[in-house]
Amino acid sequence: MKAKLLVLLCTFTATYADTICIGYHANNSTDTVDTVLEKNVTVTHSVNLLEDSHNGKLCLLKGIAPLQLGNCSVAGWILGNPECESLISKESWSYIVETPNPENGTCYPGYFADYEELREQLSSVSSFERFEIFPKESSWPNHTVTGVSASCSHNGKSSFYRNLLWLTEKNGLYPNLSKSYVNNKEKEVLVLWGVHHPSNIGVQRAIYHTENAYVSVVSSHYSRRFTPEIAKRPKVRDQEGRINYYWTLLEPGDTIIFEANGNLIAPWYAFALSRGFESGIITSNAPMNECDAKCQTPQGAINSSLPFQNVHPVTIGECPKYVRSAKLRMVTGLRNIPSIQSRGLFGAIAGFIEGGWTGMIDGWYGYHHQNEQGSGYAADQKSTQNAINGITNKVNSVIEKMNTQFTAVGKEFNKLERRMENLNKKVDDGFLDIWTYNAELLVLLENERTLDFHDSNVKNLYEKVKSQLKNNAKEIGNGCFEFYHKCNNECMESVKNGTYDYPKYSEESKLNREKIDGVKLESMGVYQILAIYSTVASSLVLLVSLGAISFWMCSNGSLQCRICI
Protein backbone atom coordinates (compact mmCIF):
# COMPACT_ATOMS: atom_id res chain seq x y z
CA MET A 1 0.00 0.00 0.00
CA LYS A 2 2.88 2.38 0.81
CA ALA A 3 4.34 1.76 -2.63
CA LYS A 4 1.07 2.67 -4.31
CA LEU A 5 0.72 5.87 -2.31
CA LEU A 6 4.25 6.81 -3.37
CA VAL A 7 3.29 6.38 -7.03
CA LEU A 8 0.28 8.64 -6.48
CA LEU A 9 2.45 11.36 -5.02
CA CYS A 10 4.77 11.12 -8.01
CA THR A 11 1.95 12.05 -10.37
CA PHE A 12 1.63 15.43 -8.60
CA THR A 13 5.36 16.11 -8.76
CA ALA A 14 5.84 15.72 -12.50
CA THR A 15 9.34 16.11 -13.76
CA TYR A 16 10.33 19.07 -15.89
CA ALA A 17 9.45 18.82 -19.60
CA ASP A 18 10.73 20.84 -22.58
CA THR A 19 8.07 23.01 -24.22
CA ILE A 20 7.60 25.24 -27.24
CA CYS A 21 4.76 27.72 -27.74
CA ILE A 22 3.48 29.58 -30.78
CA GLY A 23 2.37 33.13 -30.19
CA TYR A 24 2.31 36.66 -31.49
CA HIS A 25 3.71 40.08 -30.71
CA ALA A 26 2.13 42.48 -28.23
CA ASN A 27 3.17 45.94 -27.07
CA ASN A 28 1.98 48.91 -25.02
CA SER A 29 0.06 50.49 -27.91
CA THR A 30 -3.34 51.99 -27.12
CA ASP A 31 -4.40 52.39 -30.77
CA THR A 32 -7.95 51.27 -31.38
CA VAL A 33 -9.74 50.46 -34.62
CA ASP A 34 -13.25 49.47 -35.60
CA THR A 35 -14.20 46.42 -37.61
CA VAL A 36 -17.46 45.20 -39.09
CA LEU A 37 -18.13 43.15 -35.96
CA GLU A 38 -16.34 45.06 -33.20
CA LYS A 39 -15.63 48.58 -32.04
CA ASN A 40 -12.53 49.95 -30.33
CA VAL A 41 -10.34 46.91 -30.88
CA THR A 42 -6.89 47.58 -29.38
CA VAL A 43 -4.15 46.78 -31.89
CA THR A 44 -0.36 46.82 -31.94
CA HIS A 45 -0.03 48.99 -35.04
CA SER A 46 -2.38 51.09 -37.17
CA VAL A 47 -2.34 53.96 -39.64
CA ASN A 48 -4.54 57.02 -39.63
CA LEU A 49 -6.37 57.75 -42.90
CA LEU A 50 -8.19 60.91 -41.76
CA GLU A 51 -6.57 64.34 -41.55
CA ASP A 52 -8.28 66.55 -38.99
CA SER A 53 -5.77 69.37 -38.53
CA HIS A 54 -4.88 72.59 -40.35
CA ASN A 55 -2.55 75.51 -39.65
CA GLY A 56 -5.23 78.21 -39.51
CA LYS A 57 -3.49 80.29 -42.18
CA LEU A 58 -3.67 81.15 -45.85
CA CYS A 59 -0.55 79.90 -47.60
CA LEU A 60 1.13 79.94 -50.95
CA LEU A 61 -0.01 77.03 -53.06
CA LYS A 62 3.02 75.22 -54.50
CA GLY A 63 5.01 78.42 -54.22
CA ILE A 64 2.41 80.66 -55.91
CA ALA A 65 0.73 83.39 -53.87
CA PRO A 66 -3.06 83.74 -53.76
CA LEU A 67 -4.93 86.83 -54.90
CA GLN A 68 -6.24 88.48 -51.74
CA LEU A 69 -9.13 90.76 -52.56
CA GLY A 70 -9.03 92.39 -49.12
CA ASN A 71 -12.00 94.72 -48.73
CA CYS A 72 -13.05 94.16 -52.34
CA SER A 73 -15.50 91.65 -53.71
CA VAL A 74 -15.03 89.77 -56.96
CA ALA A 75 -17.35 92.30 -58.60
CA GLY A 76 -15.35 95.26 -57.30
CA TRP A 77 -12.11 93.66 -58.47
CA ILE A 78 -13.21 92.66 -61.98
CA LEU A 79 -15.10 95.91 -62.72
CA GLY A 80 -12.27 98.03 -61.36
CA ASN A 81 -13.83 99.75 -58.35
CA PRO A 82 -11.51 102.71 -57.64
CA GLU A 83 -11.04 101.45 -54.06
CA CYS A 84 -9.69 98.19 -55.53
CA GLU A 85 -7.07 99.93 -57.68
CA SER A 86 -4.22 98.05 -55.96
CA LEU A 87 -5.50 94.80 -57.49
CA ILE A 88 -5.19 95.99 -61.10
CA SER A 89 -1.57 94.88 -61.38
CA LYS A 90 -2.34 91.33 -60.20
CA GLU A 91 -2.46 89.05 -63.22
CA SER A 92 -1.69 85.57 -61.80
CA TRP A 93 -2.48 83.69 -58.60
CA SER A 94 -2.89 80.24 -57.14
CA TYR A 95 -6.37 80.93 -55.79
CA ILE A 96 -8.60 83.89 -54.94
CA VAL A 97 -9.50 84.89 -51.37
CA GLU A 98 -12.60 86.95 -50.64
CA THR A 99 -13.61 88.03 -47.14
CA PRO A 100 -17.15 87.17 -45.96
CA ASN A 101 -18.56 90.73 -46.22
CA PRO A 102 -16.33 92.90 -48.43
CA GLU A 103 -17.09 96.62 -48.44
CA ASN A 104 -16.14 97.47 -52.01
CA GLY A 105 -18.27 95.82 -54.67
CA THR A 106 -20.27 97.68 -57.30
CA CYS A 107 -19.75 101.29 -56.26
CA TYR A 108 -22.60 102.55 -58.48
CA PRO A 109 -25.70 100.59 -57.39
CA GLY A 110 -27.31 98.15 -59.78
CA TYR A 111 -27.84 94.54 -60.74
CA PHE A 112 -24.92 92.35 -61.81
CA ALA A 113 -26.35 89.82 -64.27
CA ASP A 114 -25.27 86.20 -63.86
CA TYR A 115 -22.82 87.23 -61.16
CA GLU A 116 -22.69 83.77 -59.60
CA GLU A 117 -21.89 82.22 -62.97
CA LEU A 118 -19.10 84.77 -63.46
CA ARG A 119 -17.63 83.82 -60.08
CA GLU A 120 -17.81 80.18 -61.11
CA GLN A 121 -15.94 80.98 -64.33
CA LEU A 122 -13.28 83.01 -62.51
CA SER A 123 -12.78 80.24 -59.96
CA SER A 124 -11.08 78.17 -62.66
CA VAL A 125 -8.85 81.03 -63.86
CA SER A 126 -5.27 81.17 -62.59
CA SER A 127 -4.11 84.18 -64.62
CA PHE A 128 -5.29 86.66 -67.20
CA GLU A 129 -4.02 89.36 -69.52
CA ARG A 130 -5.72 92.71 -68.92
CA PHE A 131 -5.77 94.74 -72.12
CA GLU A 132 -7.55 97.72 -73.66
CA ILE A 133 -10.34 96.32 -75.76
CA PHE A 134 -11.42 99.83 -76.83
CA PRO A 135 -8.68 102.40 -76.18
CA LYS A 136 -10.05 105.37 -74.29
CA GLU A 137 -8.44 108.10 -76.34
CA SER A 138 -9.21 106.82 -79.84
CA SER A 139 -12.31 104.65 -79.72
CA TRP A 140 -14.98 107.25 -78.95
CA PRO A 141 -14.05 110.55 -80.67
CA ASN A 142 -17.66 111.79 -80.78
CA HIS A 143 -18.45 111.11 -77.12
CA THR A 144 -17.22 112.24 -73.75
CA VAL A 145 -15.40 109.42 -71.95
CA THR A 146 -14.84 111.08 -68.60
CA GLY A 147 -18.14 110.28 -66.93
CA VAL A 148 -17.74 109.95 -63.13
CA SER A 149 -19.92 109.54 -60.05
CA ALA A 150 -19.66 110.58 -56.43
CA SER A 151 -20.68 107.06 -55.43
CA CYS A 152 -17.41 105.79 -56.95
CA SER A 153 -15.22 108.43 -55.35
CA HIS A 154 -11.50 107.91 -54.84
CA ASN A 155 -9.30 109.99 -52.56
CA GLY A 156 -12.26 112.29 -51.95
CA LYS A 157 -12.97 112.94 -55.64
CA SER A 158 -15.65 111.58 -57.96
CA SER A 159 -14.37 108.74 -60.10
CA PHE A 160 -15.49 105.63 -61.95
CA TYR A 161 -14.59 102.03 -62.65
CA ARG A 162 -11.08 101.42 -63.98
CA ASN A 163 -12.29 98.86 -66.55
CA LEU A 164 -15.38 100.68 -67.86
CA LEU A 165 -16.07 104.02 -69.56
CA TRP A 166 -19.22 106.07 -68.99
CA LEU A 167 -19.96 107.59 -72.40
CA THR A 168 -21.94 110.83 -72.34
CA GLU A 169 -22.92 113.61 -74.80
CA LYS A 170 -20.28 115.76 -76.45
CA ASN A 171 -20.98 119.27 -77.62
CA GLY A 172 -24.69 118.73 -77.01
CA LEU A 173 -24.83 115.60 -79.18
CA TYR A 174 -24.79 111.84 -78.62
CA PRO A 175 -24.33 110.28 -82.08
CA ASN A 176 -25.20 106.65 -82.68
CA LEU A 177 -22.17 104.50 -82.06
CA SER A 178 -21.05 101.14 -83.39
CA LYS A 179 -17.89 99.44 -82.25
CA SER A 180 -16.61 95.92 -82.73
CA TYR A 181 -13.73 93.79 -81.46
CA VAL A 182 -12.31 90.58 -82.94
CA ASN A 183 -10.75 88.21 -80.42
CA ASN A 184 -7.22 87.55 -81.66
CA LYS A 185 -5.84 86.42 -78.30
CA GLU A 186 -6.20 82.66 -78.92
CA LYS A 187 -7.89 82.50 -75.52
CA GLU A 188 -11.32 83.20 -74.14
CA VAL A 189 -11.78 86.91 -73.53
CA LEU A 190 -14.00 88.21 -70.75
CA VAL A 191 -15.84 91.38 -71.83
CA LEU A 192 -17.86 93.50 -69.37
CA TRP A 193 -20.19 96.46 -69.94
CA GLY A 194 -23.13 98.22 -68.36
CA VAL A 195 -26.43 99.93 -69.12
CA HIS A 196 -27.40 103.09 -67.27
CA HIS A 197 -30.99 103.47 -66.01
CA PRO A 198 -31.60 107.13 -64.99
CA SER A 199 -34.05 108.11 -62.28
CA ASN A 200 -35.99 110.60 -64.44
CA ILE A 201 -36.39 111.82 -68.02
CA GLY A 202 -34.54 115.04 -67.28
CA VAL A 203 -31.34 113.17 -66.44
CA GLN A 204 -31.82 111.05 -69.56
CA ARG A 205 -32.07 114.10 -71.81
CA ALA A 206 -29.19 115.91 -70.14
CA ILE A 207 -26.72 113.04 -70.46
CA TYR A 208 -27.78 111.34 -73.71
CA HIS A 209 -30.02 113.83 -75.57
CA THR A 210 -32.57 111.13 -76.38
CA GLU A 211 -35.59 109.64 -74.71
CA ASN A 212 -35.68 106.41 -76.73
CA ALA A 213 -32.24 105.00 -76.20
CA TYR A 214 -31.13 101.42 -76.72
CA VAL A 215 -27.99 99.32 -76.35
CA SER A 216 -27.33 96.27 -78.52
CA VAL A 217 -24.60 93.67 -77.88
CA VAL A 218 -24.10 90.81 -80.35
CA SER A 219 -21.55 88.01 -80.83
CA SER A 220 -21.73 84.47 -82.19
CA HIS A 221 -23.01 83.18 -78.85
CA TYR A 222 -24.59 86.29 -77.35
CA SER A 223 -27.30 88.62 -78.60
CA ARG A 224 -29.26 91.07 -76.51
CA ARG A 225 -30.92 94.47 -76.89
CA PHE A 226 -31.33 96.64 -73.80
CA THR A 227 -33.77 99.50 -73.25
CA PRO A 228 -33.17 101.88 -70.34
CA GLU A 229 -35.82 101.80 -67.63
CA ILE A 230 -36.32 105.39 -66.49
CA ALA A 231 -37.90 105.42 -63.03
CA LYS A 232 -37.46 106.90 -59.61
CA ARG A 233 -35.92 104.47 -57.16
CA PRO A 234 -34.89 104.48 -53.50
CA LYS A 235 -31.49 106.02 -52.98
CA VAL A 236 -28.57 103.64 -52.66
CA ARG A 237 -25.18 105.20 -52.04
CA ASP A 238 -26.99 108.48 -52.62
CA GLN A 239 -28.04 107.41 -56.13
CA GLU A 240 -31.58 107.09 -57.46
CA GLY A 241 -30.34 105.79 -60.81
CA ARG A 242 -28.94 102.33 -61.47
CA ILE A 243 -26.32 100.68 -63.67
CA ASN A 244 -26.87 97.05 -64.56
CA TYR A 245 -23.70 95.11 -65.33
CA TYR A 246 -23.32 92.39 -67.96
CA TRP A 247 -20.57 90.12 -69.27
CA THR A 248 -19.85 87.49 -71.87
CA LEU A 249 -17.01 85.18 -72.87
CA LEU A 250 -15.72 85.73 -76.39
CA GLU A 251 -14.24 82.68 -78.08
CA PRO A 252 -10.98 82.98 -80.09
CA GLY A 253 -11.71 84.43 -83.52
CA ASP A 254 -15.19 85.56 -82.54
CA THR A 255 -16.40 89.16 -82.92
CA ILE A 256 -18.44 91.25 -80.49
CA ILE A 257 -20.36 94.32 -81.74
CA PHE A 258 -21.69 97.19 -79.60
CA GLU A 259 -24.35 99.54 -80.96
CA ALA A 260 -26.08 102.28 -78.96
CA ASN A 261 -27.59 105.73 -79.09
CA GLY A 262 -27.27 106.30 -75.36
CA ASN A 263 -26.91 104.78 -71.88
CA LEU A 264 -23.92 102.53 -72.72
CA ILE A 265 -21.28 101.94 -70.07
CA ALA A 266 -18.64 100.80 -72.54
CA PRO A 267 -15.86 98.25 -72.07
CA TRP A 268 -12.43 99.79 -71.58
CA TYR A 269 -10.36 96.83 -70.48
CA ALA A 270 -11.07 93.15 -71.13
CA PHE A 271 -9.34 89.97 -69.91
CA ALA A 272 -7.76 87.11 -71.86
CA LEU A 273 -8.25 84.16 -69.50
CA SER A 274 -5.89 81.30 -68.68
CA ARG A 275 -7.57 78.39 -66.93
CA GLY A 276 -6.00 76.57 -63.98
CA PHE A 277 -7.63 73.41 -62.68
CA GLU A 278 -6.28 73.91 -59.16
CA SER A 279 -7.52 77.49 -58.81
CA GLY A 280 -10.65 78.54 -56.99
CA ILE A 281 -12.37 81.20 -54.90
CA ILE A 282 -12.63 80.76 -51.16
CA THR A 283 -14.30 82.95 -48.57
CA SER A 284 -12.09 83.28 -45.51
CA ASN A 285 -10.92 85.57 -42.73
CA ALA A 286 -7.80 83.50 -42.07
CA PRO A 287 -4.56 85.52 -41.97
CA MET A 288 -2.00 85.30 -44.75
CA ASN A 289 1.33 83.66 -43.98
CA GLU A 290 4.53 82.92 -45.90
CA CYS A 291 3.91 79.18 -45.53
CA ASP A 292 3.69 76.93 -48.58
CA ALA A 293 1.13 74.16 -48.93
CA LYS A 294 -0.43 71.77 -51.41
CA CYS A 295 -3.96 72.06 -50.07
CA GLN A 296 -5.84 75.13 -48.88
CA THR A 297 -9.19 75.35 -47.11
CA PRO A 298 -11.02 78.44 -45.80
CA GLN A 299 -10.01 77.47 -42.26
CA GLY A 300 -6.34 76.92 -43.03
CA ALA A 301 -3.84 74.95 -45.06
CA ILE A 302 -3.55 71.16 -44.91
CA ASN A 303 -0.20 69.49 -45.44
CA SER A 304 -1.11 65.83 -45.61
CA SER A 305 -0.86 62.84 -47.91
CA LEU A 306 -3.78 61.07 -46.24
CA PRO A 307 -6.76 60.16 -48.45
CA PHE A 308 -9.46 61.77 -46.27
CA GLN A 309 -9.97 64.96 -44.27
CA ASN A 310 -12.77 66.37 -42.13
CA VAL A 311 -11.50 69.96 -41.93
CA HIS A 312 -13.69 71.61 -44.59
CA PRO A 313 -15.64 70.55 -47.71
CA VAL A 314 -14.26 73.48 -49.77
CA THR A 315 -10.66 72.84 -50.81
CA ILE A 316 -8.16 74.12 -53.36
CA GLY A 317 -5.12 72.22 -54.58
CA GLU A 318 -4.15 68.60 -54.06
CA CYS A 319 -6.46 67.86 -51.17
CA PRO A 320 -7.78 64.76 -49.41
CA LYS A 321 -11.43 63.88 -49.95
CA TYR A 322 -13.74 65.48 -47.40
CA VAL A 323 -15.81 63.08 -45.30
CA ARG A 324 -17.90 63.58 -42.19
CA SER A 325 -16.20 60.80 -40.28
CA ALA A 326 -14.56 61.49 -36.93
CA LYS A 327 -12.22 58.49 -37.16
CA LEU A 328 -10.80 56.42 -40.01
CA ARG A 329 -8.00 54.21 -38.73
CA MET A 330 -6.73 51.13 -40.56
CA VAL A 331 -5.07 48.31 -38.66
CA THR A 332 -1.65 47.14 -39.85
CA GLY A 333 -0.67 45.08 -36.81
CA LEU A 334 -2.37 42.52 -34.62
CA ARG A 335 -4.89 42.49 -31.82
CA ASN A 336 -3.02 43.86 -28.83
CA ILE A 337 -3.83 41.54 -25.93
CA PRO A 338 -0.68 41.23 -23.80
CA SER A 339 -0.74 37.99 -21.85
CA ILE A 340 -0.43 37.80 -18.07
CA GLN A 341 3.19 36.82 -17.65
CA SER A 342 2.53 34.04 -15.13
CA ARG A 343 3.78 30.51 -15.52
CA GLY A 344 1.52 27.52 -15.62
CA LEU A 345 1.98 24.00 -14.33
CA PHE A 346 4.64 23.25 -16.94
CA GLY A 347 6.31 26.67 -16.87
CA ALA A 348 4.97 27.71 -20.29
CA ILE A 349 4.04 31.31 -20.98
CA ALA A 350 0.56 31.75 -22.37
CA GLY A 351 0.50 31.55 -26.15
CA PHE A 352 -1.79 32.83 -28.85
CA ILE A 353 -5.02 31.79 -27.16
CA GLU A 354 -4.64 33.90 -24.02
CA GLY A 355 -2.64 36.79 -25.38
CA GLY A 356 0.44 38.12 -27.13
CA TRP A 357 4.04 38.40 -26.01
CA THR A 358 5.58 41.77 -25.22
CA GLY A 359 8.94 40.02 -25.01
CA MET A 360 8.97 39.24 -28.73
CA ILE A 361 9.96 42.51 -30.37
CA ASP A 362 11.58 41.45 -33.66
CA GLY A 363 8.52 40.07 -35.43
CA TRP A 364 4.77 39.63 -35.44
CA TYR A 365 4.60 35.86 -34.99
CA GLY A 366 7.03 33.45 -33.42
CA TYR A 367 7.99 31.03 -30.69
CA HIS A 368 8.76 30.81 -27.02
CA HIS A 369 10.73 27.76 -25.91
CA GLN A 370 11.90 26.39 -22.59
CA ASN A 371 14.37 23.59 -21.95
CA GLU A 372 17.30 22.73 -19.70
CA GLN A 373 19.43 25.35 -21.45
CA GLY A 374 16.99 28.14 -20.67
CA SER A 375 14.14 29.93 -22.40
CA GLY A 376 13.65 32.64 -24.99
CA TYR A 377 11.62 34.26 -27.74
CA ALA A 378 12.26 34.05 -31.46
CA ALA A 379 10.23 35.63 -34.26
CA ASP A 380 9.34 33.71 -37.38
CA GLN A 381 10.86 36.15 -39.84
CA LYS A 382 9.44 34.60 -43.00
CA SER A 383 5.78 34.70 -41.98
CA THR A 384 6.26 38.13 -40.41
CA GLN A 385 7.84 39.60 -43.54
CA ASN A 386 5.20 38.07 -45.80
CA ALA A 387 2.50 39.59 -43.61
CA ILE A 388 4.19 43.00 -43.55
CA ASN A 389 4.55 43.00 -47.34
CA GLY A 390 0.94 41.96 -47.85
CA ILE A 391 -0.51 44.50 -45.45
CA THR A 392 1.75 47.32 -46.67
CA ASN A 393 0.67 46.67 -50.26
CA LYS A 394 -2.96 46.61 -49.19
CA VAL A 395 -2.73 49.88 -47.25
CA ASN A 396 -0.91 51.57 -50.13
CA SER A 397 -3.51 50.27 -52.56
CA VAL A 398 -6.39 51.56 -50.44
CA ILE A 399 -4.75 54.97 -50.06
CA GLU A 400 -3.97 55.15 -53.78
CA LYS A 401 -7.52 54.24 -54.78
CA MET A 402 -9.18 56.64 -52.36
CA ASN A 403 -6.58 59.41 -52.51
CA THR A 404 -8.11 61.33 -55.43
CA GLN A 405 -6.57 64.76 -54.91
CA PHE A 406 -8.77 67.52 -56.26
CA THR A 407 -10.21 71.00 -55.79
CA ALA A 408 -13.74 71.33 -54.44
CA VAL A 409 -15.04 74.90 -54.63
CA GLY A 410 -18.40 76.10 -53.42
CA LYS A 411 -21.15 76.60 -55.96
CA GLU A 412 -22.61 80.07 -56.43
CA PHE A 413 -26.31 80.92 -56.23
CA ASN A 414 -27.99 84.30 -56.11
CA LYS A 415 -30.81 85.27 -53.77
CA LEU A 416 -33.43 84.31 -56.34
CA GLU A 417 -32.11 80.77 -56.64
CA ARG A 418 -32.68 79.58 -53.07
CA ARG A 419 -34.73 76.58 -54.12
CA MET A 420 -31.99 75.51 -56.52
CA GLU A 421 -29.35 76.13 -53.85
CA ASN A 422 -31.25 74.05 -51.30
CA LEU A 423 -31.68 71.26 -53.84
CA ASN A 424 -27.97 71.43 -54.64
CA LYS A 425 -27.13 71.19 -50.93
CA LYS A 426 -29.31 68.12 -50.60
CA VAL A 427 -27.59 66.51 -53.59
CA ASP A 428 -24.15 67.41 -52.24
CA ASP A 429 -25.11 66.10 -48.81
CA GLY A 430 -26.26 62.88 -50.43
CA PHE A 431 -22.96 62.44 -52.24
CA LEU A 432 -21.09 63.33 -49.07
CA ASP A 433 -23.03 60.74 -47.10
CA ILE A 434 -22.23 58.13 -49.75
CA TRP A 435 -18.53 59.03 -49.73
CA THR A 436 -18.43 58.89 -45.94
CA TYR A 437 -20.29 55.57 -45.85
CA ASN A 438 -18.00 54.07 -48.51
CA ALA A 439 -14.87 55.24 -46.71
CA GLU A 440 -16.02 53.93 -43.34
CA LEU A 441 -17.21 50.61 -44.78
CA LEU A 442 -13.95 50.14 -46.67
CA VAL A 443 -11.92 50.66 -43.49
CA LEU A 444 -14.19 48.39 -41.43
CA LEU A 445 -13.94 45.57 -43.98
CA GLU A 446 -10.18 45.89 -44.40
CA ASN A 447 -9.67 45.94 -40.63
CA GLU A 448 -11.73 42.77 -40.28
CA ARG A 449 -9.74 41.08 -43.05
CA THR A 450 -6.40 42.13 -41.59
CA LEU A 451 -7.17 40.79 -38.12
CA ASP A 452 -8.49 37.55 -39.63
CA PHE A 453 -5.33 37.41 -41.74
CA HIS A 454 -3.16 37.61 -38.62
CA ASP A 455 -5.23 34.94 -36.85
CA SER A 456 -4.82 32.70 -39.88
CA ASN A 457 -1.05 33.23 -39.93
CA VAL A 458 -0.73 32.27 -36.26
CA LYS A 459 -2.87 29.19 -36.84
CA ASN A 460 -0.78 28.20 -39.87
CA LEU A 461 2.40 28.52 -37.81
CA TYR A 462 0.84 26.35 -35.11
CA GLU A 463 -0.18 23.71 -37.65
CA LYS A 464 3.33 23.80 -39.14
CA VAL A 465 4.84 22.89 -35.75
CA LYS A 466 2.15 20.33 -35.03
CA SER A 467 2.71 18.54 -38.34
CA GLN A 468 6.44 18.27 -37.60
CA LEU A 469 6.20 17.03 -34.01
CA LYS A 470 3.34 14.58 -34.59
CA ASN A 471 3.24 12.25 -31.56
CA ASN A 472 6.70 13.26 -30.33
CA ALA A 473 4.94 15.97 -28.33
CA LYS A 474 1.51 16.67 -26.95
CA GLU A 475 -0.67 19.75 -27.15
CA ILE A 476 -1.12 21.31 -23.73
CA GLY A 477 -3.24 24.30 -24.75
CA ASN A 478 -2.45 28.00 -25.06
CA GLY A 479 -0.65 27.27 -28.32
CA CYS A 480 1.99 25.16 -26.56
CA PHE A 481 3.50 21.69 -27.06
CA GLU A 482 5.23 19.54 -24.45
CA PHE A 483 7.95 17.28 -25.83
CA TYR A 484 8.10 13.59 -24.97
CA HIS A 485 11.86 13.85 -25.43
CA LYS A 486 14.68 16.16 -24.50
CA CYS A 487 14.87 19.05 -26.96
CA ASN A 488 17.98 21.20 -26.67
CA ASN A 489 18.48 24.55 -28.41
CA GLU A 490 19.56 22.88 -31.64
CA CYS A 491 16.41 20.77 -31.57
CA MET A 492 14.28 23.84 -30.85
CA GLU A 493 15.87 25.68 -33.77
CA SER A 494 15.07 22.81 -36.11
CA VAL A 495 11.40 23.01 -35.11
CA LYS A 496 11.37 26.74 -35.80
CA ASN A 497 13.03 26.51 -39.21
CA GLY A 498 11.04 23.46 -40.33
CA THR A 499 13.91 20.91 -40.32
CA TYR A 500 12.86 18.93 -37.23
CA ASP A 501 14.03 15.27 -37.49
CA TYR A 502 11.01 13.29 -36.35
CA PRO A 503 12.57 9.77 -36.65
CA LYS A 504 15.58 10.86 -34.58
CA TYR A 505 13.43 11.49 -31.51
CA SER A 506 10.58 9.05 -32.08
CA GLU A 507 12.06 6.13 -30.08
CA GLU A 508 12.79 8.27 -27.01
CA SER A 509 9.35 9.82 -27.30
CA LYS A 510 7.71 6.39 -27.52
CA LEU A 511 9.42 5.15 -24.34
CA ASN A 512 8.55 8.29 -22.38
CA ARG A 513 5.01 8.22 -23.67
CA GLU A 514 4.60 4.58 -22.49
CA LYS A 515 6.01 5.45 -19.05
CA ILE A 516 3.56 8.30 -18.70
CA ASP A 517 0.67 6.08 -19.84
CA GLY A 518 1.76 3.45 -17.25
CA VAL A 519 1.77 6.01 -14.49
CA LYS A 520 -1.73 6.99 -15.52
CA LEU A 521 -2.96 3.36 -15.34
CA GLU A 522 -1.30 2.79 -11.94
CA SER A 523 -2.81 5.98 -10.69
CA MET A 524 -6.24 4.80 -11.79
CA GLY A 525 -5.76 1.56 -9.73
CA VAL A 526 -4.88 3.56 -6.66
CA TYR A 527 -7.94 5.73 -7.18
CA GLN A 528 -10.16 2.61 -7.38
CA ILE A 529 -8.71 1.15 -4.10
CA LEU A 530 -9.18 4.44 -2.32
CA ALA A 531 -12.75 4.62 -3.57
CA ILE A 532 -13.57 1.12 -2.20
CA TYR A 533 -11.96 1.85 1.16
CA SER A 534 -13.83 5.11 1.39
CA THR A 535 -17.19 3.47 0.62
CA VAL A 536 -16.72 0.66 3.18
CA ALA A 537 -15.55 3.03 5.88
CA SER A 538 -18.46 5.36 5.29
CA SER A 539 -20.95 2.46 5.51
CA LEU A 540 -19.46 1.18 8.80
CA VAL A 541 -19.61 4.64 10.34
CA LEU A 542 -23.25 4.96 9.28
CA LEU A 543 -24.22 1.55 10.77
CA VAL A 544 -22.47 2.23 14.07
CA SER A 545 -24.19 5.61 14.31
CA LEU A 546 -27.63 4.10 13.67
CA GLY A 547 -27.02 1.35 16.29
CA ALA A 548 -25.97 3.84 18.93
CA ILE A 549 -29.01 6.01 18.34
CA SER A 550 -31.36 3.00 18.52
CA PHE A 551 -29.80 1.75 21.79
CA TRP A 552 -30.13 5.19 23.37
CA MET A 553 -33.77 5.52 22.33
CA CYS A 554 -34.68 2.05 23.63
CA SER A 555 -33.03 2.72 26.99
CA ASN A 556 -35.09 5.82 27.71
CA GLY A 557 -38.37 4.42 26.38
CA SER A 558 -38.51 6.54 23.29
CA LEU A 559 -38.32 3.45 21.12
CA GLN A 560 -39.97 0.07 21.72
CA CYS A 561 -38.64 -3.02 20.07
CA ARG A 562 -40.89 -6.09 19.68
CA ILE A 563 -39.81 -9.41 18.31
CA CYS A 564 -42.66 -11.62 17.07
CA ILE A 565 -42.18 -15.32 16.46
From Swiss-Prot:
Keywords: Clathrin- and caveolin-independent endocytosis of virus by host, Clathrin-mediated endocytosis of virus by host, Disulfide bond, Fusion of virus membrane with host endosomal membrane, Fusion of virus membrane with host membrane, Glycoprotein, Hemagglutinin, Host cell membrane, Host membrane, Host-virus interaction, Lipoprotein, Membrane, Palmitate, Signal, Transmembrane, Transmembrane helix, Viral attachment to host cell, Viral envelope protein, Viral penetration into host cytoplasm, Virion, Virus endocytosis by host, Virus entry into host cell. Residues 1-17 form the signal peptide. The record marks R343, G344 as: Cleavage. Its main location: virion. Disulfide bonds join C21-C480, C59-C291, C72-C84, C107-C152, C295-C319, C487-C491. Belongs to the influenza viruses hemagglutinin family. This is Hemagglutinin. It comes from Influenza A virus (strain A/China:Nanchang/11/1996 H1N1). The gene is HA.
